[in-house]
């Protein structure tokens, strides 16, 4: 099945080499802006602001003020806004209502290009965030993270299908492998999405055992991979510049006969 290419500013997600996203994390405004400078220096395709690390994440006004400063720092780089809940490996927790309103404030600010909404925040929250985003020309990544295990292939595929059905532009799944077979499960689901999904997809198997999944997206179909510029935001992330070199080698050689 031919999939949609998702355009964020001048970036095309779902065509060519996987795009590199560098997360920005930090507790204070100073740490976050310093992290943004490091991220920019790594020359990523897009930057993820992990707002759940921010000590004032529950204050939408302070978050929007910080987003304006981030936008000035990052220039034309696409910005993905993410509050990763503690239940999915993040640094903080918010009520569903607060989570929704924080995402809506970021969307309305005009300073972000894409938002991440967790599938298990509930259908109503996901639909509301998708509606707000799309009315403001902001793209949506619907996500699910399992830091303990790799669910069965059928379950992973069902979650991706639900994300697509709820209106996400890009479904995302990250899982923890307990064995190399778990990594194969994740890659098999990713590859099968090329035949059944209408959207690009982002998948990864975490930690050292899952590292290969962060590198082989062009072969199996994962459209974005995450690399670190300083502090990583998840197990298994490698340096963004090192990551780009590996992706380029695969890209240059994958079509050879």
Where would I find each of the regions flagged by the language model?
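Short amphipathic alpha-helical surface micro-motifs
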Residues: 1-7, 63, 185-186, 207-208
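Short, Lys/Arg-enriched, disordered terminal segments
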Residues: 1-9, 252-257
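Active-site beta->alpha loop and helix N-cap motifs at the rims of alpha/beta catalytic domains
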Residues: 2-4, 16-135, 145-149
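Short boundary motifs at domain starts and secondary-structure transition points
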Residues: 9-15
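Catalytic alpha/beta core domains of metabolic enzymes, predominantly
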Residues: 104, 114, 119-257
């Amino acid at each position: 099945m031919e999939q949609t290419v998702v355009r964020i500013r001048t970036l095309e997600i779902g065509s060519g080499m996987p795009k590199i996203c560098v997360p920005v994390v930090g507790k204070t405004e100073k740490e976050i802006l310093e992290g943004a400078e490091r991220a920019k220096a790594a020359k990523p395709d897009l930057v993820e602001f992990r707002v759940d690390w921010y000590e004032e994440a529950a204050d939408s006004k302070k978050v929007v003020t910080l987003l304006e400063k981030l936008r000035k720092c990052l220039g034309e780089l696409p910005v993905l806004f993410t509050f990763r809940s503690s239940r999915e490996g993040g640094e903080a927790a918010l009520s569903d209502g607060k989570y929704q309103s924080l995402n809506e404030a970021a969307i309305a600010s005009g300073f972000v290009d894409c938002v991440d909404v967790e599938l298990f925040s509930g259908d109503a929250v996901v639909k509301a965030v998708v509606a707000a985003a799309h009315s403001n020309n902001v793209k949506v990544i619907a996500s699910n993270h399992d830091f303990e295990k790799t669910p069965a292939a059928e379950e992973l595929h069902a979650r991706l299908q639900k994300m697509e059905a709820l209106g996400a532009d890009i479904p995302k799944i990250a899982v923890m492998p307990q064995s190399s077979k778990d990594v194969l499960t994740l890659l098999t689901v990713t590859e099968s999405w090329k035949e059944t999904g209408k959207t690009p997809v982002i998948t990864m198997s975490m930690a050292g055992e899952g590292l290969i999944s962060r590198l082989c997206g062009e072969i199996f179909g994962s459209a974005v991979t995450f690399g670190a510029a300083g502090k990583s935001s998840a197990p298994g992330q490698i340096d963004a510049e090192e990551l780009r070199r590996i992706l380029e080698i695969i890209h240059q050689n994958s079509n050879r006969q």
